[in-house]
Regions:
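Alpha-helical transmembrane segments of multi-pass membrane proteins, especially transporters
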Residues: 15, 19, 61, 65, ...
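Cytosolic-side transmembrane-helix boundaries in multi-pass membrane proteins
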Residues: 1-25, 31-35, 229, 236-243, ...
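Hydrophobic core segments of alpha-helical transmembrane domains in multi-pass membrane transport
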Residues: 19-35, 72-77, 97-103, 124-129, ...
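Helix-loop-helix "hairpin" substructures at the membrane interface of multi-pass membrane proteins
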Residues: 192-270, 294-295, 299
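Transmembrane alpha-helical segments in multi-pass inner-membrane proteins
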Residues: 250-330
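Transmembrane helix-bundle core of multi-pass membrane transporters
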Residues: 56, 145-217, 350-353
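Single transmembrane alpha-helix segments in multi-pass membrane proteins
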Residues: 32-37, 47-107, 120, 124-146, ...
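Interfacial/capping segments of alpha-helical transmembrane domains
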Residues: 31-52, 167-179
Length: 354
């Protein structure tokens, strides 16, 4: 019979092969799901893995989706490596969007292009403020950061709804819950004509390099990771757990807020109730599929972007519910968790005893 046996040390091979095996299992389970739903599995897989790549416009949309996923995942990786469990990046994303939207609404057509920087800064500060609530409650009252950050997601959604249904509602918007469309001067510069992709993707890649340097080439980044991997050793070395907590959540909140600012000042162009698209939760999967490594998360962000686009296409072309995106994300996450058992364990055949 097959039996799991602990490895003497974690397998480096399976650490990086596990996400690939998890993706393969997700594809196989996805085929089974399409068959159960009475849909052509080949066409279903085409929606998820070919359509998002087949044209320049499709690649542009892929980058539009990947930008917020990558930025949020970078911040979450810093948190998770620091043993700080920020599950509320979605709320920080929303509050970053709200803060950025507030600045954008103050601009008029005569405002200078400097307002774009002000919008991005407001987004960063909005996300940091929302993450700071979690950090303060954890630091002051030892509140569980998982529950606090998660509950604050719903508070952020309510703040957004209040604003777009109330004081920020566009009087000329036919009673739709949305702000007026932001002035053209507030828009993030586009990379390609005829596409929604903006310079935000370049900013995200710059942040990848910055996080890599921070984590692997600075003493502060080393201290963050020691605090996460070995808290006792961290205290013995004199590293501050309070500093680690605040820094992790401020970085994570700042990246999530920046993602929110890029979203509302880019492809959306206004505030509405549909700003919360689930990027904050999907970025958790991005972070773990990418092994909490900045470069790995570039590839996992692209993969999860394909799931978002594939879900939209499956809904419009195959009549499947929009929740198919979440189903594929869940399949990937649980497959990864299952495959990760091979990192610390190995399968051995154990014969029956006489």
């Amino acid at each position: 019979m097959l039996k799991f046996e602990a490895r003497p040390q974690a397998s480096l091979f399976w650490r990086y092969a596990s996400p690939l095996l998890a993706l393969l299992i997700t594809v196989v389970l996805g085929i089974g799901l399409f068959v159960l739903l009475g849909k052509d599995p080949v066409r279903g897989l085409q929606m998820f893995f070919w359509e998002p790549l087949k044209s320049a416009y499709a690649l542009g949309e892929l980058m539009v989706k990947a930008t917020p996923l990558l930025l949020i995942a970078l911040g979450l990786a810093v948190c998770f490596r620091s043993n700080v469990w920020n599950i509320g990046a979605e709320g920080q994303f929303v509050m970053g969007a709200v803060a950025a939207g507030g600045v954008a609404l103050l601009a008029d057509k005569d405002t200078g292009r400097w307002v774009v920087l002000a919008i991005l800064l407001a987004g960063v500060l909005g996300g940091m403020f929302w993450a700071g609530i979690t950090a303060w409650l954890k630091d002051k009252f030892h509140a569980n950061e998982i529950l606090v950050s998660l509950m604050l997601v719903y508070v952020a959604d309510m703040v957004l709804s209040y604003l777009v249904y109330g004081p920020w509602k566009d009087p000329a918007g036919y009673n739709f819950p949305q702000t007026k469309t932001f002035e053209a001067v507030t828009q993030i510069p586009r990379l390609m004509t005829g596409s929604r992709v903006s310079v935000g993707i370049l900013l995200a890649l710059l942040c990848v390099a910055a996080v890599w340097v921070f984590l692997f080439r600075t003493r502060l980044g080393f201290a963050q990771q020691v605090g996460g991997l070995a808290p006792a050793a961290s205290r013995y070395a004199g590293f501050s757990s309070r500093q680690s907590l605040w820094l992790a959540l401020m970085v994570s909140g700042g990246f999530a807020g920046l993602a929110g600012a890029l979203e509302v000042a880019g492809p959306i162009g206004q505030l509405n109730p549909y700003v919360p698209a689930g990027y904050g939760f999907a970025a958790i999967i991005v972070a773990y599929v990418g092994r909490l490594h900045p470069v790995g998360m570039v590839f996992s962000a692209v993969l999860l972007s394909m799931f978002f686009i594939g879900g939209e296409l499956a809904q419009s072309r195959m009549g499947l519910p929009k929740s198919i995106t979440g189903v594929f994300q869940g399949l990937l996450l649980f497959s990864l968790l299952a495959c990760d058992t091979l990192v610390a364990n190995q399968l051995r055949w154990q014969g029956r005893r006489a």
